[in-house]
Design a protein with these regions (language model features):
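Extracytoplasmic electron-transfer domains, predominantly the class I c-type cytochrome c fold
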Residues: 1-24, 56-114
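Sequence/structural segment immediately N-terminal to covalent heme-attachment motifs in c-type
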Residues: 29-55, 66, 79-84, 117-118
């Protein structure tokens, strides 16, 4: 995600968008700010995250409506993501991990996440 703070306007505009993102996620937010942030979100964020905030997974755009917050789901963390941007796509590992190692790694990650079996 590129830095979008300047594209949104000033810090108050960014804060409005942050509250719209919090609203999409069903988190505590300021309703007035979220309403104002909706228009800015539609201008700067919809192309990647979609109008519903579900994100385009094929390009690495996060789903803003779930409980998975790679860089934090607080107002401060979301603000930082918008202002500074994020580069967080994981490179492909198929060229140096065979199928067996991929399954083992998958099982390990699921195990430490508490999600159960693959």
């Amino acid at each position: 995600m590129p830095p979008l703070g300047a594209a949104l306007g000033g810090s108050e505009d960014v804060r409005d968008v942050v509250h719209h993102v919090l609203a999409l996620a069903g988190r505590t937010h300021d309703g007035l700010r979220a309403q104002r942030g909706m228009a800015k979100f539609a201008t700067a964020c919809v192309a990647c995250h979609g109008a519903d905030g579900k994100g385009n997974q094929q390009i690495g755009a996060a789903n803003l409506t779930d409980d998975i917050w790679l860089h934090g789901g607080t107002e401060a963390a979301i603000t930082e993501s918008i202002v500074k941007g994020r580069i967080n796509q994981m490179p492909a590992h198929k060229d140096f991990l065979d199928e067996g190692k991929i399954h083992l790694l998958t099982a390990y990650v699921l195990g430490i996440s508490g999600q159960g079996k693959p």
